Amino acid sequence: MNTEATHDQNEALTTGARLRNAREQLGLSQQAVAERLCLKVSTVRDIEEDKAPADLASTFLRGYIRSYARLVHIPEEELLLGLEKQAPLRAAKVAPMQSFSLGKRRKKRDGWLMTFTWLVLFVVIGLSGAWWWQDHKAQQEEITTMADQSSAELSSNSEQGQSVPLNTSTTTDPATTSTPPASVDTTATNTQTPAVTAPAPAVDPQQNAVVSPSQANVDTAATPAPTAATTPDGAAPLPTDQAGVTTPVADPNALVMNFTADCWLEVTDATGKKLFSGMQRKDGNLNLTGQAPYKLKIGAPAAVQIQYQGKPVDLSRFIRTNQVARLTLNAEQSPAQ
């Protein structure tokens, strides 16, 4: 009889009232319950007064009530049944509407973010393409300008070369003027021939190279046949043999270039003299000598192989960027931009 009366009394009480009575029986205050459940005191007060905060979703409200019931030792199922009877509409309608509005706002925000991202991406791609095109166009214009300059210089040099007359008939070599005395002396005995050719070492090597054929002809023509037969080695004494002409020593600062394709090139030495300026064809070779350091401009670095002081010059950084190579080769063979 008493149990049924208590059960009827509990059913008459609301969810908030039952929680408040259980809290008071345990001697707990609203502040203590709020601290244990990590809630605000105002939230605990609204639950006990059966108020549902407008900014609080029904899912969270049910979770708070379940935690509160466990704290005060009340069966959770009884409280949830009573809560559904008190506010069935709010649990059915309010939550879906709020979820729909949140999803709509999130979708709108994501759309704006995606649009802005694509806009930034297009701007970056456009700027990169414009920069590349301007750089490529500037390089092509520079190569064209340098090729035109070299063509103009070659044409002017060819015109000057055609206007200069050749004076080979009027110029006389000092060594050739001494030929008549040599022929007169060679008519004597064979013992006088070394005396005539003895002054030859004092003559310049370049003059010896020119005079030696004429002197050889004069000696062989003027000397009688028996005299030529009496020589031990059977050869007439040539001035070039007695002069001791030495081959020139290779310049240590020589610049050697081999071309694997057509390439425009300009080389200037330390004095500002242009050693070469023009177009080199495929499979061509170029050997230049001047005063170091050398300044080089190469239109197609991938088409040329350079050796300086017997060592190869690295052009890989210009080949990777596909740009006109401007470098300086100093005495230590350290190319610099």
UniProtKB/Swiss-Prot annotation:
Per the record, the major location class is membrane
- GO MF assignments: DNA binding
SMART domains in the record, alphabetically? Answer: HTH_XRE
What PROSITE patterns does the database record attribute to this sequence?
A: HTH_CROC1
- Extract the DNA-binding region annotation as residue ranges: 30-49
Q: Which Gene3D superfamilies match?
A: lambda repressor-like DNA-binding domains
Extent of Polar residues compositional bias: 145-167, 208-218
Membrane-crossing ranges are: 112-132
Q: Which InterPro entries does this entry report, sorted A to Z?
A: Bact_Cytoskel_RodZ (IPR050400), Cro/C1-type_HTH (IPR001387), Lambda_DNA-bd_dom_sf (IPR010982), RodZ (IPR023690), RodZ-like_C (IPR025194)
Task: List the subcellular locations.
Answer: Cell inner membrane
**Its topology with respect to the membrane?**
Single-pass type II membrane protein
GO cellular component labels: plasma membrane
The annotated region (Disordered) lies at 145-235
The residue spans the entry assigns to the Cytoplasmic side of the membrane are as follows 1-111
Sorted keywords for this record are: Cell inner membrane, Cell membrane, Cell shape, DNA-binding, Membrane, Signal-anchor, Transmembrane, Transmembrane helix
Q: Which family does it belong to?
A: Belongs to the RodZ family.
> What note about domains is in the entry?
The helix-turn-helix (HTH) motif in the cytoplasmic domain of the N-terminus is involved in the formation of spirals to maintain the rigid rod shape. As this protein is anchored in the cytoplasmic membrane, the HTH motif may contribute to protein-protein interactions to form the RodZ helix, which is localized beneath the cytoplasmic membrane. The C-terminal domain may be critical for determination of the rod shape by probably interacting with enzymes required for synthesis of the peptidoglycan layer, including PBPs in the periplasm.
> What is the purpose of this protein?
Cytoskeletal protein that is involved in cell-shape control through regulation of the length of the long axis.
Q: What is this protein called?
A: Cytoskeleton protein RodZ
For this protein's source organism, the top of the classification is: Bacteria, Pseudomonadati, Pseudomonadota, Gammaproteobacteria, Enterobacterales
